[in-house]
Amino acid sequence: GIVIINTCGFIESAKQESIDTIIRFSEAKEEGLVDRVYVTGCLSERYKDELKDGIPEVDAWFGTRDLPRLLKTLKADYKRELVGERLLTTPAHYAYLKIAEGCDRPCAFCAIPLMRGKHVSTPMEDLVKQAKSLAANGVRELILIAQDLTYYGLDIYRERKLAELVRRLSDVDGIDWIRLHYAFPTGFPMDVLDVMAERSNVCNYLDMPLQHASDDILKSMRRGITQEKMDRLIGDIRNRVPEIALRTTLICGFPGETEAHHQDMLEWTARMRFERVGCFTYSHEENTHAFKLEDDVSEEVKRKRVEAIMEQQAGISYELNQKFVGTQQRALVDRTEDGIW
């Protein structure tokens, strides 16, 4: 048989996991357990030449936009499997719908533009068609994702079209929930909040990675925004949709981050009271703008700062969730296990 390994090359731990998987299946090929090994995805896009030399057992390497070449390489039987309906890796009732590929933002810490290229929006007609197909197969929740939802439409329609897309997807029969992930703060199209308020199947939820709160670090990260502007944006969002649940992600230990910068972020997250926060240690990635800077915060300090943010946030999330005690809420059940749903 053929093994196709879809890799990630975003941060060091993901790269190592991908390489370990490639080596494992290369050894399986040497033992006669598989016939061919193909590697695709971000790691292949970013390090193809180096990996070719280091792991010659791989039969072919494909980049992030090489699906046509991959299909051409495969025999007809395998090709039919790849171009047919989606095989969901999520529970059957929800699916991720990727509305764009690539990113035009200049964030200093991020290697995605190197691997995924410029932002390319998927035409609305194609996305509506995908949504109808997913709904026909039992999907009830669509989670819209992209490296940058905010930019959707600017490249192919010459204007931001996220609101129109969400409205059209909400018209698809059978879709009960639509959720928005990964919206960039700068230039966020506020009209999408009007759709959120109007449509009962568009969740009052927004995932907007803000990454830091200190103006010094935001500038060094090349985020194009200040703490004051983020405060104003979050206030405007909550005014438009008072019941909205906001999630953000933050990075601890970016080059030059001092204890004062960290305390600034702690105080800011306490004041913002996000419903959810994800916090990660900075990963020093080659070929990014930040790689020129000294990775001067120790791994131990990075971890402690993440723990401080997440410990504080656990208390905030708990307090915010108390308003739901004693209420009835609609839910989708992922699984049941020993009387637990």
Where are each of the predicted segments found?
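Cofactor-cradling patches in redox/metallo enzymes
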Residues: 1-72
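Conserved SAM/AdoMet-binding glycine-rich loop
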Residues: 35-41, 46, 51, 136-260
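N-terminal [4Fe-4S]-dependent radical SAM core
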Residues: 61, 67-96
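Canonical Radical SAM [4Fe-4S] cluster-binding loop centered on the CxxxCxxC motif
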Residues: 92-125
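Conserved, mostly hydrophobic/aromatic
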Residues: 107, 127, 144, 180, ...
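Conserved alpha-helical substructure of the radical SAM core
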Residues: 116-143
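C-terminal, non-catalytic macromolecule-binding modules
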Residues: 240, 260-309
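Terminal RNA-binding accessory module
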Residues: 292-341
